[in-house]
């Protein structure tokens, strides 16, 4: 069964899906890491692929930018395609001075001022969490491959935080003690959908900019320079 946003048939999607934001990153992943693959969705250019990685069936599907976009695609995967696990892999802004470009962050809890939960489910919810079980597998896999991993909380915004008139005013509205290490624009909707539909979600992010460093990742680096994060997600996913 297809949806208005996904032409894949139900059996075309694996139980575990890796979700980058960028469709070109989805293409890059299957072309460079999968044993074999097929394109199962290209509606609106939001590519989805299913294939095998180290002999295990996995899917990779892009989710676009922002909570409404990832909210639609992840909801449909969980609800209509019987997906059980989603790992979002994306970019983020670093909020701690010790973080460097391309450091990998595992998001534990997410705060958002969005009304996503209220609109979708009539719940006034602004903090939600990733799945502990999936996160534990990711942590163990990172140790196995000697990949440095920073765990912490994330703020999820409705606009690119770099463009905020005053980011400190926004941070002043973050709950006391939340202490975010990163900022991005999608994880809240993904985690909330997983909670609502009794599924599992995790989120890995690579730092591509920070107010503490002058360097920023180029568009090309954002597409292809995240290989450690990609490998970590894939090698974790085959253990779910």
Task: Put a short name on every predicted segment.
Residues 188-222:
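Zn-dependent metallopeptidase/amidohydrolase metal-coordination segment
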Residues 1-137:
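Metabolite-binding pocket within alpha/beta catalytic cores that recognizes anionic/polar moieties
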Residues 36-42, 146-153, 240:
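Flexible, glycine/charged-enriched surface loops at secondary-structure junctions
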Residues 127-177:
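Active-site rim beta-loop-alpha module in soluble metabolic enzymes
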Residues 211-240:
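His/Asp/Glu-rich mid-to-C-terminal helical/loop segments that flank catalytic regions of hydrolases
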Residues 79, 166, 217:
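Expand to "…catalyze enediolate/carbanion chemistry for C-C bond making/breaking, isomerization
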Residues 137-145, 193, 232-240:
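Generic non-transmembrane alpha-helical segments
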Residues 23, 93, 155-161, 189, ...:
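Glycine-rich beta-alpha junction loops
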């Amino acid at each position: 069964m297809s949806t208005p946003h996904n032409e894949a048939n139900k059996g075309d999607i694996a139980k575990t899906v890796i979700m980058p934001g960028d469709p070109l990153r989805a293409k890059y992943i299957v072309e460079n890491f999968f044993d074999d693959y097929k394109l199962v969705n290209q509606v609106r250019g939001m590519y989805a692929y299913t294939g095998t990685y180290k002999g295990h069936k996995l899917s990779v599907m892009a989710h676009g930018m922002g909570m409404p976009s990832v909210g639609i695609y992840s909801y449909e995967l969980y609800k209509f395609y019987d997906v059980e696990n989603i790992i979002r892999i994306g970019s983020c802004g670093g909020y701690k001075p010790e973080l460097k470009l391309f450091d990998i962050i595992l998001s534990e809890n997410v705060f958002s001022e969005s009304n996503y939960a209220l609109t979708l489910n009539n719940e006034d919810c602004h903090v939600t969490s990733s799945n502990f079980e999936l996160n534990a597998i990711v942590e163990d896999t990172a140790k196995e491959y000697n990949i440095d991993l920073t765990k912490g909380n994330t703020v999820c915004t409705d606009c690119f935080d770099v463009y905020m008139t005053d980011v400190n005013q926004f941070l002043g509205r973050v709950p006391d003690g939340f202490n975010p290490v990163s900022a991005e624009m999608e994880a809240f909707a993904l985690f909330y959908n997983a909670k609502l539909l009794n599924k599992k979600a995790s989120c890995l992010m690579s730092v591509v900019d920070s107010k503490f460093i002058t360097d920023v990742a180029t568009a090309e680096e954002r597409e292809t320079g995240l290989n450690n994060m990609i490998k970590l997600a894939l090698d974790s996913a085959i253990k779910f």
